[in-house]
Structures are given as C-alpha cells and as structure tokens.
Amino acid sequence: MVTTSRTVLQVNISIVVEHRSTEHWFFDKQGKLQAWRDWRLQLSDMDAETICQEVATWWKFVPLVTKTFDPWREETWPDPWTLVSNGSFCPSAQGLGMFYSLVLSGVDCRLILAVIDEQPRLLVEVLGNKLLNYHDGEVIDDDFGEAQFLKHWAPSDLARLVKV
C-alpha cells in the first residue's frame, strides 16, 4: 500500500470522533470483521433503546461513498461479511449494515426500502415505531416526514444473505 499525506491525515483525524474510535475502518478485511464482531458482542449488555442509539451512532462514522450497491435490486446487496470487509458505505449500505448488526445481535427489526427526498434509502424499523438511518446517527420516533415506504423485509426474508 502506498501511503500518501492524505491517507495519514485521514487516519489521524478519524481515530477518535465523538469519543469513539473509528480506526477499525482502516484495518484489513479480517480486522474490520473482528472489530464489528467485538462491537456487536457489546450490544448484548444493553437495553433495547440503548442498542438502537448505539447502532445508529456506530454506523454514522463509516467511510462514505456515493453508491456501493443498488438499493432497488436486492440481488446486488452484499452479505454482512462482504459489506463490512469492503469498508466503504453509501447511505443504503449504512442501513443494511444496521439491519445486519441488529439481526446478528438477536434484535427484532425489519429492513425498509424508502424514498426520501427523491433518493432510495434502506431504513431499519425497530421496537415497532423507531427508524434508524433516516438521519445519520439518530433514532427517529413516529415522525417520518416525507418518506415513502415501498417495501419491507423481515430477517427471514433475507435468509440468503444472513442466517437467523
């Protein structure tokens, strides 16, 4: 790997954001997967509300790109391990990552394809009336604004991607 001043600057800036480490996104594929697994194991000690906020916050700090897959075409969606190990995320990939994190942690949720401001986005509904990935790092209650919900999936609907 060639190290540039930009790479070094990104690492130095992104190590700690809002009192949490984000350096795992600069690890190799195995390191990213191990960091994700270790973080998911910590969720088991939290109550449901805290888990929702922790998942929203953790996924807020991923490396963002414009598009990693087509949210309209389920067959383009990566499995959880491919998603995390690739290490770059579009807004829909953030939602899919939240969904995978919750499902693999045993939290009841469903994935929703929505259109927000004319853009498709994968959201996660949890605890019956809370949405994740509507706004970065936030858990939204009941006020879903102008979102159009087009389709939803339970974990069992996506068994080809993640075993429940």
Where does each model-flagged region fall?
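A structural boundary/capping signal
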Residues: 1-164
